[in-house]
Amino acid sequence: ELKVNNSDGMLSWSDYKNLNANLANNVAWSVVESKETNLYAQALKWAELAVGLDKNSPYFLDTLGHLYYFTGNKQKAIEVQTKAVESAKSEQNPSLEFSTTSVLNKIKANKL
């Protein structure tokens, strides 16, 4: 397996991929929380990168769903947020399933 050398030592490609996906999602989510609308377009790119690296993370999908909604793409937001709910169900995480479902309902009602 490919190893990447960084300040923390040698990381496997999988570790490096997960680290970068988490960083990208965290940056995007911080913009969602800050409500800095002028940064939504850039945050959307970070969220898309995170989901590109981990297509099944309910957390990453949730962030992406929020940002599609906030950038005016309600249909895409519903599609992605539905995947977040399904992913949370598959992880058998009731609290995450509840929160992602709540967000999905708010998106559908235009109340996010």
Region roles according to the model:
Residues E1-T71:
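Alpha-helical adaptor scaffolds
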Residues N18-A21, N38, E79, K83-L112:
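Terminal, low-structured helical/coil segments at or just beyond the last alpha-helical repeat
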